[in-house]
């Protein structure tokens, strides 16, 4: 697709926003390279991936992509036999960990919803657990190899620790015995050797090797002769340590080389998943949907919103093309929102053809176009003025040179910038030429000649942007089938231009033009009323559908709660009955034992009788557990709002929130649920009191963007704990599986306070200190329930 249209329609700005949602630099690079696909298969495949990512984000939260970075160059170095540094190995570890976690993330129970596109990608991932564990065991940080990397390294470092301890003991003794010759009663290290600061004039009093001197020459750093052998031994151990570290790094690098192909494959898949989830996150921010993609030149964008206009300012628009007409002529005054319409249609098509979900209603469709041309002006934003006539014409000439059979062409002020009569004639000729080649066109203009052309020409339709004459502002709603008008006389009158001047101006217009403008005004008014009625009807229908759906869901939940409560109560009662039987049997058994000893035979007979009575009573109670006692209690003959009543079928007290209807049904509240029941099914409670009816707030699910990381550095422990508590609540409601709490290393006070709080927090399943790439000891990784 031509780069000019991508720039003019501001697709690059969309990609800059999209990049913010990508984690890795390699995924950001894929965003930079994103352009519309040239076939419907790739378009639909990419849209389905984006839609699956959106659904996964809403159901499972963010994927575990942390730690992923572009290690392509590192893998190439390993493949060539190079030795990797600890920092490079940790980056490889980050990719290996992300691979394992990502595959685990996509594991699901058989009954759970499947996401075939992304699950297939995750299935190809090949975790390399042995290499991951070995790097994790061997590398501590970007510049430190762990003692556990090898037995040899462990032994060398243990010897080093012992030697250093011996040297420190000896040098402390030397410092104490020679303190009068020293600048300071301490020791230091020069060139990996322990030395003491001797005053220059006492050089001969402290025998040893001079390693350095101060800038003034007043102090000499001398290695006492008694430490030379010990220092030599330490130096030898340090050389052995370095050699062993080099061997460990070389061995790990070799294993990376042996697994390089798997690593490259995993990196490619993870990068692709990172890219796809960035599209899902952006779609979530836009409240976007997956449109249907047609290949017949027909599209139907419903409630389409420009993604770069602020949410509280954007006005949704409905645009159709290709079915009843192939050219849409949008007329009306300047600054009326015509350019916004063009840019919205063009940008939403480019987004959809690039695999991005679009901000529109769920019944929207776009069409596959090989080219989208936009003659709106290179530097013109939505608020800027129009280009010149020559600039327009140059762009039009370039557009007409293409094969336009599968093209969407957007013209802003077609024929503008020159004599109105000539401009209108040129505009009609251009439309005729492009239409004959099979192009789909949307053009804006304020020429009356083009309105008349659209009225008389087949497959060409008028449209206008609604204008509020009271506020002198456009509403930006598109009215298809109604040509626009300039509203010059109405605007002049509202601003204060004299009536005699306006009447004089009207006299200079032909009677036909005045009648035509009047007809347009009537059409606009009727169209506006019809659109408003349609919108109101849709709102009412949507509300009715939502209420019906909520009622059905609540009824279903109520049935489940009722059944569960009944079964639990029955099981509990059965346990009580069984326990009572067991106790009676135990007592009887004890009496039998006493009888064998000749004690209490009369008591046994009485106990047997009592046991039988108890058994009969318990069996009768057990039978009654299976019956619903719906007739218990006195029937209510009348009710009042807020009255308490007993509903036997639920075994629960409810509150009456409506009077009986013509079917004898009342609405009651049972907990958070509202249900309708027959008045005759309600029973009086011990005190059927009238309570003030409390309106329950409806629970609505909002997918809000909760960050998976909170930074507490700089806060005191009390403030940090307060923020973490609120953040964990938000993260739990946002369905995040794992979050990162950054508290820094410092003195450890803040970390201890946070950990103490996490131990008893209701939403916390597990927590641990961060690993490499997760913040180390300066961060805590929390797994939520």
UniProtKB/Swiss-Prot annotation:
GO MF terms, alphabetically ordered: ATP binding; ATP hydrolysis activity; ATP-dependent DNA damage sensor activity; endonuclease activity; mismatched DNA binding; ribosomal large subunit binding; rRNA binding
Swiss-Prot/TrEMBL GO biological process terms: mismatch repair; negative regulation of DNA recombination; rescue of stalled ribosome
Pfam family, one: MutS_V
Residues binding ATP: 332-339
Domain Smr per the UniProt entry, residue ranges: 710-785
Keyword rRNA-binding among UniProt keywords: yes
Domain of life (superkingdom): Bacteria
EC nos: 3.1.-.-, 3.6.4.-
Keywords: ATP-binding, DNA-binding, Endonuclease, Hydrolase, Nuclease, Nucleotide-binding, RNA-binding, rRNA-binding
Family: Belongs to the DNA mismatch repair MutS family. MutS2 subfamily.
PANTHER family for the chain: OS10G0509000 PROTEIN, OS10G0509000 PROTEIN-RELATED
Function: Endonuclease that is involved in the suppression of homologous recombination and thus may have a key role in the control of bacterial genetic diversity. Acts as a ribosome collision sensor, splitting the ribosome into its 2 subunits. Detects stalled/collided 70S ribosomes which it binds and splits by an ATP-hydrolysis driven conformational change. Acts upstream of the ribosome quality control system (RQC), a ribosome-associated complex that mediates the extraction of incompletely synthesized nascent chains from stalled ribosomes and their subsequent degradation. Probably generates substrates for RQC.
Complexes and interactors: Homodimer. Binds to stalled ribosomes, contacting rRNA.
Protein name: Endonuclease MutS2
Upper taxonomic lineage: Bacteria, Bacillati, Bacillota, Clostridia, Eubacteriales
């Amino acid at each position: 697709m031509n780069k000019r249209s991508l720039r003019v329609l501001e697709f690059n700005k969309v990609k800059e926003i999209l990049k913010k949602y990508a984690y890795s630099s390699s995924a950001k690079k894929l965003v930079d390279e994103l352009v519309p696909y040239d076939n419907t298969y790739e378009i639909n495949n990419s849209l389905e991936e984006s839609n699956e990512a959106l659904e996964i984000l809403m159901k499972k939260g963010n994927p575990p992509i942390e730690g992923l970075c572009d290690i392509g160059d590192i893998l190439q170095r390993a493949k060539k036999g190079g030795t990797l540094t600890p920092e490079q190995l940790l980056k490889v570890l980050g990719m290996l960990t992300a691979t394992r976690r990502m595959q685990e993330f996509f594991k699901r129970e058989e009954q759970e919803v499947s996401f075939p596109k992304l699950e297939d990608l995750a299935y190809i991932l090949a975790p390399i657990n042995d290499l991951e564990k070995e790097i994790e065991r061997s590398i501590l940080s970007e510049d430190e190899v762990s003692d556990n990397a090898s037995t040899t390294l462990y032994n060398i470092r243990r010897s080093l620790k012992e030697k250093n301890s011996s040297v420190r003991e000896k040098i402390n003794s030397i410092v104490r015995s020679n303190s009068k010759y020293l600048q300071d009663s301490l020791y230091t290290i020069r060139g990996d050797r322990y030395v003491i600061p001797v005053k220059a004039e006492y050089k001969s009093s402290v025998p040893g090797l001079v390693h350095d001197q101060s800038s003034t020459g007043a102090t000499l750093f001398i290695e006492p002769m008694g430490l030379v052998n010990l220092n030599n031994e330490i130096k030898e151990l340090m050389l052995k340590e370095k050699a062993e570290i080099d061997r460990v790094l070389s061995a790990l690098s070799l294993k990376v080389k042996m697994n390089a192909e798997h690593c490259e494959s995993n990196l490619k898949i993870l990068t692709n998943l990172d890219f796809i989830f960035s599209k899902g996150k952006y779609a979530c921010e836009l409240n976007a949907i997956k449109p249907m993609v047609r290949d017949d030149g027909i599209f139907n964008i419903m409630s389409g919103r420009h993604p770069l206009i602020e949410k509280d300012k954007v006005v949704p628009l409905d645009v159709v093309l290709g079915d009843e007409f192939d050219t849409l002529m949008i007329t009306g005054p300047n600054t009326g929102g015509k350019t916004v319409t063009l840019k919205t249609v063009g940008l939403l098509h480019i987004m959809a053809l690039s695999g991005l979900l679009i901000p529109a209603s769920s019944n929207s469709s776009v069409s596959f176009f090989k080219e989208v041309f936009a003659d709106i002006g290179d530097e013109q934003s939505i608020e800027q003025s129009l280009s010149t006539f020559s600039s327009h014409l140059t762009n039009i000439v370039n557009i007409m040179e293409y094969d336009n059979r599968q093209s969407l062409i957007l013209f802003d002020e077609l024929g503008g910038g020159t004599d109105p009569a000539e401009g209108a004639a040129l505009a009609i000729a251009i439309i005729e030429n492009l239409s004959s080649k099979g192009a789909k066109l949307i053009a804006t203009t304020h020429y009356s000649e083009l309105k008349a052309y659209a009225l008389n020409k087949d497959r060409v339709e008028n449209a206008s942007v609604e204008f509020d004459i009271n506020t002198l502002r456009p509403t930006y709603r598109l009215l298809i089938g109604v040509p626009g008008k300039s509203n010059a006389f109405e605007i002049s009158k509202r601003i204060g231009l004299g009536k005699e001047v306006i009447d004089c101006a009207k006299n200079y217009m032909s009677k036909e033009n005045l009648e035509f403008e009047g007809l347009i005004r009537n059409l606009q008014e009727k169209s506006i009323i019809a659109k408003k009625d349609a919108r109101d009807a849709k709102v009412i229908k949507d509300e009715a559908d939502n209420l019906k759906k909520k009622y059905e869901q609540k009824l279903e939940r109520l049935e489940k709660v009722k059944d569960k409560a009944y079964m639990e109560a029955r099981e509990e009662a059965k346990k009580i009955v069984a326990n009572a039987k067991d106790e009676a049997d135990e007592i009887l058994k004890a009496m039998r034992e006493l009888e064998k000893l000749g004690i209490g035979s009369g008591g046994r007979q009485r106990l047997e009788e009592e046991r039988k009575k108890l058994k009969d009573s318990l069996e009768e109670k057990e039978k009654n557990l299976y019956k619903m006692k719906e007739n218990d209690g006195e029937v209510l003959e009348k009710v009042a709002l807020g009255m308490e009543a007993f509903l036997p079928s639920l075994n629960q007290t409810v509150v009456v929130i409506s009077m009986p209807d013509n079917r004898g049904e009342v609405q009651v509240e049972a907990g958070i649920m509202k249900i309708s029941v027959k008045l005759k099914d309600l029973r009086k409670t011990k005190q059927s009191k009238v309570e003030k009816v409390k309106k329950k707030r409806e629970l609505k699910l909002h997918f809000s963007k909760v960050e998976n990381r909170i930074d507490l550095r700089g806060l005191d422990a009390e403030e940090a704990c307060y923020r973490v508590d609120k953040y964990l609540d938000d993260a739990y409601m946002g369905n995040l599986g794992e979050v990162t709490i950054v508290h820094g290393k410092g003195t450890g006070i803040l970390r201890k306070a946070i950990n103490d709080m996490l131990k008893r927090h209701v939403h916390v399943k597990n927590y641990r200190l961060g690993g490499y790439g997760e913040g180390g000891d300066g961060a805590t990784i929390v797994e939520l329930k």
